[in-house]
Amino acid sequence: MAFNMDPKKCPMPTQDPNVRNKNFEEVALGYTAEMAVNEAKRCIHCKNKPCQTGCPVGIDIPEFIGHVAEGDFEAAYQVINRSSSLPAVCGRVCPQESQCEGKCTRGIKNEPVGIGRLERFVADWHRENVHTAPIVPASNGHKVAIIGAGPAGLTAAGDLAKLGYKVTVYEALHVAGGVLMYGIPEFRLPKAIVQQEIDGLKKMGVDFECNMVIGKVLTIDELMGEYRYEAVFVGSGAGLPRFMGIPGESLKGVYSANEFLTRSNLMKAYLPTSKTPIRTGKKVAVVGGGNVAMDAARSALRLGAETVYIVYRRGMAELPARKEEVEHAEEEGIIFKTLCNPVEILPDENGFVKAITCIEMELGEPDASGRRRPIEKKGSEFTMDVDTVIMSLGTSPNPLIRSTTPGLETNKHGCIVTEGDEGKTSREGVYAGGDAVTGAATVIKAMGAGKAAAKAIDEYIQSK
């Protein structure tokens, strides 16, 4: 097979920025089969597979890409499916540039192979062309409960179901999917794709119980006692938003990004018929620089805002959001106000947001995170007229589970403490992973934690 030595990736077709910033349809349109084969031939099949070491779920990347290069897309899917329960999701939202693609040998001198784009293509091809029912393993007679139907919980459920466990997933919201459903907008991750991944788990025998708030409706003790689950995996995420504690945060027109995106993505609060309408003004300031901030800003634009600012206390080079998301936001007209930080949100006479006062920042010495610490420049305050402020400053785990589970150790941030990478907690038979352990992180890292915990749960139950 001839290699493709083009130094750059095959470009991803996308909607025109001036069209897509007014709709919620997917921005990236996906590769054609010809594009996928051409991109796959850029892989030089290194012996030590550095790309695979960068994948939290351990997909054999050179093997699946080799099948794509040969045009055998179903074989490629089967390779991915051995390790990942959510390939169509990962191909869209994983930060490949800091994981698999970040370790790609081609990336040393040129652009890395478009691993994420190829994973997405393979998953989409399989969904559109293969309609056989999944093989349901024979039951091994054991029961496991999963708390939370986000990426960690779904991955653990899928891996355990493949081993013959009877798995029930308890989800607090009225739909399964967790952050994949409520946090990531349709234009980045269509909800129909998430639902199809969940439907695949249902066909494997996984049960989903929605509107079940564990810690309120049932406790972990009840699941392991009265309901006779032999192990419990806690993948309840981190949905408690953080705020700055500045004057004006309680004004009407101030939202957490979590609330703004949940009401937009899940509750369709922007529709005129909504029972819980969301007020999106004409001038919006989004405070923060991560992927969630980009999602909130780009959603606000699509909901009718005329001007949307990203307000971030460090510089453009320090933005934690994916490079692709920043580029898409810039293309769509989002204005980046970097090296500045809010100090007050100002009200109008009716208690609504009227403006936001910020102070300019400069970068000092590196802090504990390794990034240069932002320092205020005295006397540099300025005010911007805005009528909506969205705070995207991170999230922490909800305290409900830890407060109703005696003996479950948590740290000062409210995250569940686990041993090593296996997710074992201080309670016997209780495992945890994803944002409930790490705080807000990436989808693929949560999936990796769910996968590791599923393996540990299997070993625990089989050793009893």
Each model region followed by its residue ranges:
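Local cysteine-cluster metal-coordination motifs and their immediate loop/turn environment
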Residues: K41-E63, S85-I108
